[in-house]
Regions:
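Short glycine-aspartate micro-motif
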Residues: 89, 114-118, 158-160
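C-terminal, non-catalytic interaction/recognition modules in large multi-subunit enzymes and RNPs
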Residues: 4, 8, 16, 92, ...
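Short helix-loop-beta connector
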Residues: 109-112, 273-277
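Gly/Ser/Thr-rich active-site cleft segment
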Residues: 1-94, 187-237
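A polyampholytic, Gly/Pro-enriched intrinsically disordered region
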Residues: 36-50, 88-92, 110-113, 320-336
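Phosphate-handling active-site elements
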Residues: 106-115, 136, 301-306
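Basic, amphipathic juxtamembrane/active-site segments
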Residues: 127-148
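Gly/Thr-rich phosphate-binding beta-strand-loop-beta motif of the actin/hexokinase/Hsp70
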Residues: 108-130, 167-171, 292
């Protein structure tokens, strides 16, 4: 029926772009299938003009290569692919953070699983890497969950909450402190920017505590107004709560941290990951303000702050592969397994994946195709993704292979398996990845900032109050020279707060490795 509708539209409205749901998002769930199709169709005219204009401008500038665009599946595709399916570009930026996290973890982490967070000015994005693979979800939203539109399209699982460096601190009528979800944004921005902001933010609190140098923000390009931040916190937070400005600033960071910890707890529980056995990677310009506190609260043994952490998602784009996911519906189960039908669907997926790789000219040795089945126990409502090997489902024991793989995946996520239940397979996916270049390292180009390797300044810490701490220049830390907090590690792009008794060092690959320690999980409001 959809194909016939397309024929009629092409006859009567030639040139008008059409999106067919069975091609874009074959799903049994009508709402998700419909909403993703509507979103994609509405974006096609806009993205066609945008991509066309971009390619024309680059051609005029002398660029003769291919334009690649990021996708929400953690890959890049040719610009023409985005024209055909612009929904691929939704939420593509945050989807790159776990790609960078996976790369960094492979270099400097011994844990199998990794939690990745990216703290910007307005949002806090959390994602995961499980044993080198980035989990997907079908529950991505265009804005706040349940208050915006569900995309219904498979993408990297990223949970976002309104908690960033620009999050506004406020006290409600009952005397309870909140941080966010409102944000000062970049305009007018935090009070300390001096651009008209009047509401105290996380950045203002960090400035009052001495965690940010007012004369070295963005390497000294912006001078911050400490006095204005102090006044705003005193008037809007400290006064109503009966606290000193420093205690109020600490409280702001505590509440901010708890919002983030809750977001991490939600996604790790949903994906069956134990934070106490996972490393955690902090990225984004504001991550360093509470990354150690977050890691300690979650019980993570190791915290990594990449040298490129302030641009974590951009770094992920640098090391991502060209690739795309393909999906086919085919329902079968472990008690009456249709081997021939499954084999046909896997062949379709393989053909589509190989055609994609051929289109970009990727050599076979640089191309990998991963297969997944979306499966569930009989009569359950939701499926989980189960990694499979296509060749294992073509033999006489295909049903047993599917059943055992599902039981293992279900137990890993939910700590439970039901050997006696029938396993239903609903849909089949292939993810093709084409490596276009070997990236040896993610490093920031060296620049003589004129900063000394170690300085000192006053900073406020829970339990000890205002004290003089060393401030280390990130880029000048010697590899594997172990140091202990309290301290601040500073670069042109971020400030990393290291509480007392926490050890840290810089790895040979340039990343900061921190052992948070359980002692730092105490809440500063109790100090």
């Amino acid at each position: 029926h959809e194909l016939r509708v397309e024929e009629i539209l092409n006859e009567r409205l030639p040139g008008v772009p059409v999106t067919l749901s069975h091609r874009l998002n074959p799903s049994l769930r009508e709402y998700r299938r419909t909403i993703s199709t509507a979103i994609d169709a509405s974006l096609k005219p806009l993205m066609d003009r945008y991509i066309g204009g971009l390619e024309a401008a680059m051609l005029d500038a002398g660029f003769s290569g291919k334009v690649l665009v990021l996708t929400s599946q953690g890959t890049m595709v040719n610009a023409d692919e985005i024209r055909r399916a612009p929904i691929l570009a939704l939420n593509s930026g945050p989807s790159m953070a776990p790609i960078a996290g996976n790369y960094v973890a492979a270099t400097d982490s011994s844990e199998a699983d990794t939690i990745v967070f990216d703290t910007g000015g307005t949002t806090f994005d959390v994602s995961l890497v499980r044993a080198g693979h980035v989990p997907f979800t079908h529950e991505s939203w265009l804005g706040r969950p349940y208050q915006s539109d569900l995309t219904g399209f498979p993408s990297v699982d990223v949970k976002s909450v309104g908690a960033g460096g620009g999050s506004i601190a406020w006290v409600d009528d009952g005397g309870v402190l909140h941080v966010g979800p409102q944000s000062a944004g970049s305009v007018p921005g935090p009070v300390c920017y001096g651009a008209g902001g009047t509401e105290p933010t996380v950045s203002d609190a960090a400035l009052v505590l001495g965690y940010i140098d007012p004369d070295y923000f963005l390497g000294g390009r912006i001078r911050l107004d400490l006095a204005a931040s102090r006044r705003a916190i005193a008037d809007k937070v400290a006064g109503p709560l009966g606290l000193s400005s420093e205690a109020a600033a600490l409280a702001i960071l505590d509440v901010w941290t708890e919002n983030m910890v809750q977001a991490i707890s939600d996604i790790t529980v949903n994906q069956g990951i134990d934070p106490t056995t996972a490393s955690i990677i902090g990225g984004g310009g504001a991550a360093g303000l509470n990354a150690v506190a977050i890691a300690a609260r979650m019980g993570c043994p190791t915290l990594l702050i990449p040298e490129v952490g302030a641009g974590l998602s951009a770094a992920g784009a640098v090391v991502s592969d060209v690739g795309r996911g393909f999906r086919r519906l085919f329902v079968t189960n472990s008690s009456a397994f249709d081997t021939a039908g499954v084999r046909a669907k896997l062949a379709e997926l393989r053909t589509a994946a190989e055609a994609f790789a051929a289109q970009i000219g990727a050599p076979a040795e640089a191309t990998a195709i991963d297969y997944f089945v979306e499966a569930r126990y009989a009569h359950q409502v939701w499926e989980i993704d189960v990694a499979i090997k296509a060749e294992d489902l073509e033999g006489p024991n295909a049903a047993e292979v599917l059943r055992d793989a599902f039981h293992d995946a279900h137990e890993r996520i939910f700590a439970f398996r039901d050997e006696g239940s029938i396993v239903e397979a609903i849909a089949w996916r292939a993810q093709v990845r084409c490596k276009i270049a070997e990236t040896t390292e993610l490093r920031i180009a060296s620049e003589d900032t004129g900063e000394t390797a170690v300085r000192n300044r006053q900073a406020y810490f829970a339990g000890i109050g205002l004290t003089e701490v060393p401030v280390y220049a990130f880029e000048r830390l010697s590899a594997d020279d172990v140091r202990t907090g309290p301290a601040i590690v500073e670069s042109r792009f971020t400030s990393i707060v290291v509480p007392p008794a926490v050890t840290f060092r810089r790895s040979p690959s340039g990343n900061l490795i921190v052992q948070p320690g359980a002692a730092n999980a105490t809440n500063s409001l109790k100090s």
